[in-house]
Curated annotation (Swiss-Prot):
The lineage of its organism: Bacteria, Pseudomonadati, Pseudomonadota, Alphaproteobacteria, Rickettsiales. The gene is rplX. InterPro entries: Rib_uL2_dom2 (IPR014722), Ribosomal_uL24 (IPR003256), Ribosomal_uL24_CS (IPR005825), Ribosomal_uL24_KOW (IPR041988), Translation_prot_SH3-like_sf (IPR008991). This is Large ribosomal subunit protein uL24. One of its GO terms (molecular function) is rRNA binding. Part of the 50S ribosomal subunit. Transmembrane segments: none annotated. GO terms for biological process: translation. Keywords: Ribonucleoprotein, Ribosomal protein, RNA-binding, rRNA-binding.
Length: 104
């Protein structure tokens, strides 16, 4: 089970976008040799805007770029950043906030 999944509300903790809050839209996994990397695409964070030329004129477009999962942290229900742990509940593994000990 993964610590951050799509649909989670996260806060960017480092980089140019530090302090911004958004919802994870997609989790991307890539491997280069033996190194495995995990990236997330967060809505309204790390967005680049550009102009496309069309026959009708100019069209403004925006694209979200991935952020390394180590640069984001999960937001707990009280609005503060929390680490994620795991507990067994009814025989299944569930994620919990370590800060509040509540289930995600």
């Amino acid at each position: 089970m993964k610590r951050i999944v799509s649909g989670d509300q996260v806060k960017v903790i480092s980089g140019n976008e530090a302090g911004k809050v958004g919802v994870v839209r997609k989790v991307l996994y890539s491997s280069v040799g033996r190194r495995k990397e995990v990236y997330v695409i967060v809505s309204d964070v790390n967005v680049r805007r550009f102009v496309k030329k069309t026959q009708a004129g100019k069209k403004f477009d925006a694209k979200s770029y991935p952020i390394a999962v180590s640069n984001v942290a999960l937001l707990a229900g009280d609005g503060f950043v929390s680490k994620v742990g795991f507990k067994l509940k009814d025989g299944t593994k569930k994620r919990i906030f370590k800060r509040t000990a509540e289930f995600v």
